[in-house]
Amino acid sequence: MLFPPLRSLFLFTLLLSSVCFLQIKADHDDESDLGSDIKVDKRLKFENPKLRQAYIALQSWKKAIFSDPFNFTANWNGSDVCSYNGIYCAPSPSYPKTRVVAGIDLNHADMAGYLASELGLLSDLALFHINSNRFCGEVPLTFNRMKLLYELDLSNNRFVGKFPKVVLSLPSLKFLDLRYNEFEGKIPSKLFDRELDAIFLNHNRFRFGIPKNMGNSPVSALVLADNNLGGCIPGSIGQMGKTLNELILSNDNLTGCLPPQIGNLKKVTVFDITSNRLQGPLPSSVGNMKSLEELHVANNAFTGVIPPSICQLSNLENFTYSSNYFSGRPPICAASLLADIVVNGTMNCITGLARQRSDKQCSSLLARPVDCSKFGCYNIFSPPPPTFKMSPEVRTLPPPIYVYSSPPPPPSSKMSPTVRAYSPPPPPSSKMSPSVRAYSPPPPPYSKMSPSVRAYPPPPPPSPSPPPPYVYSSPPPPYVYSSPPPPPYVYSSPPPPPYVYSSPPPPYVYSSPPPPYVYSSPPPPPPSPPPPCPESSPPPPVVYYAPVTQSPPPPSPVYYPPVTQSPPPPSPVYYPPVTNSPPPPSPVYYPPVTYSPPPPSPVYYPQVTPSPPPPSPLYYPPVTPSPPPPSPVYYPPVTPSPPPPSPVYYPPVTPSPPPPSPVYYPSETQSPPPPTEYYYSPSQSPPPTKACKEGHPPQATPSYEPPPEYSYSSSPPPPSPTSYFPPMPSVSYDASPPPPPSYY
């Protein structure tokens, strides 16, 4: 019989052995549950079981990538997964002595493929950034194992299907960027019951209205623009006053009246509802939005008199109410008294102002007052929002910068940690730089809009030292929000210091200047032959998270995703050359949206074209944008349109030769560009297939340029790394891909 001490020791040893056995068995069960067919070489030695699982996940994903033009995954071999390009490791939050894969940043890699289900093995992942690639299919359900995932950026790819509900099961998620994809159907109401800080769903195919519990969300930035939502703006919007800084609902086919509850949004700096079908008067409660800097209500059917309280807002910088049916404005709103405010009130029914509607239009049904109670919209309030534990820090997003100007600069070649902007991803620089995000789709400069430009101070210059390590923890730093020069709409958050993998994310600094946010529909993207999955330019990387111990991933989020690199296409827009992409025959300035032959007037029949000139060849004048529509409106028709073309040279879909330098293009016969307005909007162009299979020839679908970037980053990318990544176009969210073409 064993003595009591020996028996206790024996039982303890047995228990410890059982726990270790169960852990090892669980690891192998995870692998078998995911159906991985990766055979791990027995000669490979791994630092710990977590990195062994990461090896299986990344090797499975590598097999699911059909095209890697910059050989970004070339060094994804061997057991040292922490040295793989785009992979960042950090100490586990649960076991600090154990290194795990904490971040993935493949922004602007121009890869084509799909997301392997084995990625669910990366259960310690805190950030996943793959914007501005050509990944297609659907988001695997196995992502529900990523309990620490804080930032998810899938923008500017070719994902399809309904809203990926797996994101609703991620308990730590704070930043969600699904812009510029082909998601469709309803926006789930549960999304607004989650404790998210930023939601970007613009430029998809969502329909069936905005959920009535919208006001339950504690987000600081909400962008649902360029879908086909329809319906009313919920009255519950008034419940978002404590956190909301920016709301963009433009070009969503919204109807009804503007709910008076918007007066509760006292922290909102940017409010944009242009290009919808809203009616009735502007509520006088708008005068309570004390922080308002940008108010855009153009291209609707508003009537009545402009409330005087709007023109008394002390922070107002841009008030655009053109293309409505307003019948009057108070004397205080006269342009002479608003010298410091950009005001555009053309195409209304205001007596005494220039460029107003005709008497016939001003006596039409649309110009008559409406009874807003008949719409039955904003009287419905959703139940009180769930109580969220807000981090002590004050979150304030800098107002987006509407820059009606040229697209952002081309991405740099080196890969830097994800830079997040509400716009296209920033250019990668060093292996590990703080993630910077910018949120503003840099559309080409457009003529018809008052130049309200808002820029946030660019992030500080990169420090020579490597980025701080990922730290999994600590509450998110307070949002720092400053508005410097007017260039782009940039929300940049400082790079996460140590990657802190824990609940609160690192402080969000919404400040790096992203590409200009332009309200305009992007020109039809030039079709390009993508790999097995539809090809599209990569969006900006978006990243803001809790400090982490290893070097933080790339820069932070951006409103509109940007660009990728690829061969020069015959697109009608001139984009700055992108690093690593072959230079086009010669830069050609195409008219923004017009692909069809212009009017008979200036017709030049090119004699250089290989094929006989069509009946009326087009002479594309230099940079001259197509004539603005009758009324200065930010956005094109109500139909949402796909992401604007990114500043990338896309190879033409057809084998036709590249256009000669002096571009006198013959009509459609010679160049592949689609006819006018052949821009596929979310509601019009057929969504890509739900799955992309290797071996299938790429389909010539119009490539969507990366959306503009809102950079959530506040710190510049880290210094160039000692080890260089394969050439890869990267655009910091501040320099997101080319903005979508302006709708003017």
Swiss-Prot record:
Span list, region Disordered: 408-445, 518-537, 555-576, 658-744
Localization terms from the record: Secreted, Cell wall
Comp. bias (Pro residues): 704-729
LRR repeats: 122-145, 147-170, 171-194, 196-217, 219-240, 241-265, 266-289, 290-313, 315-336, 381-404
Sequence ranges of Low complexity compositional bias: 430-439
Gene3D superfamilies named in the record: Ribonuclease Inhibitor (3.80.10.10)
GO cellular component: extracellular region; plant-type cell wall; plasmodesma
Entries under InterPro entries matching the protein: Leu-rich_rpt, LRR_dom_sf, LRR_extensin-like_regulator, LRR_N_plant-typ
One GO term (biological process): trichoblast differentiation
Free-text description of this protein's post-translational modifications in UniProt: Hydroxylated on proline residues in the S-P-P-P-P repeat.
Phenotype seen when the gene is deleted: Irregular root hair development that frequently abort, swell, or branch. Stronger phenotype when associated with LRX2 disruption; frequent rupture of root hairs soon after their initiation.
The UniProt record lists the keyword Repeat: yes
Tissue-by-tissue expression: Expressed in root hair cells (at protein level).
Record's signal peptide: 1-26
Keyword entries, A-Z: Cell wall, Cell wall biogenesis/degradation, Developmental protein, Glycoprotein, Hydroxylation, Leucine-rich repeat, Repeat, Secreted, Signal
Glycosylation sites: 71, 77, 253, 318, 344
Region (Contains the Ser-Pro(4) repeats): 382-744
Any one Gene Ontology molecular-function term assigned to this protein's record: structural constituent of cell wall
Functional description taken from the UniProt entry: Modulates cell morphogenesis by regulating cell wall formation and assembly, and/or growth polarization. Together with LRX2, component of the extracellular mechanism regulating root hair morphogenesis and elongation.
Record protein name field: Leucine-rich repeat extensin-like protein 1
Species: Arabidopsis thaliana
Gene, per the UniProt record: LRX1
